[in-house]
Amino acid sequence: MKTYYEKDANVELLKGKTVAVIGYGSQGHAQAQNLRDSGVEVVVGVRPGKSFEVAKTDGFEVMSVSEAVRTAQVVQMLLPDEQQAHVYKAGVEENLREGQMLLFSHGFNIHFGQINPPSYVDVAMVAPKSPGHLVRRVFQEGNGVPALVAVHQDATGTALHVALAYAKGVGCTRAGVIETTFQEETETDLFGEQTVLCGGVTALVKAGFETLTEGGYRPEIAYFECLHELKLIVDLMYEGGLTNMRHSISDTAEFGDYVTGSRIVTDETKKEMKRVLTEIQQGEFAKKWILENQAGRPTYNAMKKAEQNHQLEKVGAELREMMSWIDAPKELVKK
């Protein structure tokens, strides 16, 4: 595994160039501000609206996507996956010039062929492994978050060097930048989200909550045991792995972990995980998600509404009112 650090990257490669950050959401605002603080010339390309005004207030030169691409030598696409192909076709593609670099922080659209850049531009990825607010905060503290770097197309012969310069400008080489491929990043990212981080965890939490409430236990107690305390466990794992978590919990809990975990996540569960991975590798999930967006998201919206109306969510909202230390969002926004 090749990992790059500060000594391996030269942010001076970006000096005299302009970086266009397309999109000004979680990653967009963080990467743009970190680059600017590293002495890089940055413009923001977004359509008129809330993000346009926020970027302007933050002191950036804000312009249309088309103008930003024409202005820049490096173009970083930081829009949601489902928006990128449309924006690329509408404002990026016709304005690309020989020798430019097209950057991504997730490989979905390149790997699954939704964006097909011309052969005369570099195509690379710099993917910080943290949400935008943490990318920014840790940078301001003088540190950085780890990231992945990949080169899909090296038209100039300098794609990796420029990508590493970008990673250094964002602060990621302070922690370490691991070399990967668009395929590996995309497929593992989707797999992790679907089977563990999002799909797996939410299904497990709901199943535990429902088992307790169906067994006659109060929903408030079920919420505490199956959702609320999950943060305590995940934080311990995040800080020091499974061993640290098991060292920190009671011996009773640890023994229960050993003798019960494999009864819940069974060999059949792992077989299903492998089937999910195959679907991702063969592009079945990508096709399903692309078609879902083209159809106006009927399944997505119906499932989202059903999940929001689950008893777990209603009980949780009431209990969180008791927790003064939680800064509950007044408005739900994508991070």
UniProtKB/Swiss-Prot annotation:
One Gene Ontology cellular component annotation held by this UniProt entry: cytosol
Pathway: Amino-acid biosynthesis; L-isoleucine biosynthesis; L-isoleucine from 2-oxobutanoate: step 2/4; Amino-acid biosynthesis; L-valine biosynthesis; L-valine from pyruvate: step 2/4
EC number: 1.1.1.86
Binding residue positions for substrate: S250
Binding-site residues, Mg(2+) 2: D189, E225, E229
Cofactor note as given: Binds 2 magnesium ions per subunit.
GO MF annotation: an example: ketol-acid reductoisomerase activity
Alphabetized Pfam families for the sequence: KARI_C, KARI_N
Cofactor(s) needed for function: Mg(2+)
Residue ranges annotated for the KARI C-terminal knotted domain, each copy included: 181-326
Residues given in the record as NADP(+) binding sites: Y24, G25, S26, Q27, R47, S51, D81, E82, Q83, Q84, G132
UniProt keyword Metal-binding present: yes
Recorded catalytic activity of this chain's protein: (2R)-2,3-dihydroxy-3-methylbutanoate + NADP(+) = (2S)-2-acetolactate + NADPH + H(+); (2R,3R)-2,3-dihydroxy-3-methylpentanoate + NADP(+) = (S)-2-ethyl-2-hydroxy-3-oxobutanoate + NADPH + H(+)
Active site as annotated: H106
Protein role: Involved in the biosynthesis of branched-chain amino acids (BCAA). Catalyzes an alkyl-migration followed by a ketol-acid reduction of (S)-2-acetolactate (S2AL) to yield (R)-2,3-dihydroxy-isovalerate. In the isomerase reaction, S2AL is rearranged via a Mg-dependent methyl migration to produce 3-hydroxy-3-methyl-2-ketobutyrate (HMKB). In the reductase reaction, this 2-ketoacid undergoes a metal-dependent reduction by NADPH to yield (R)-2,3-dihydroxy-isovalerate.
Name by which UniProt lists this protein: Ketol-acid reductoisomerase (NADP(+)) 2
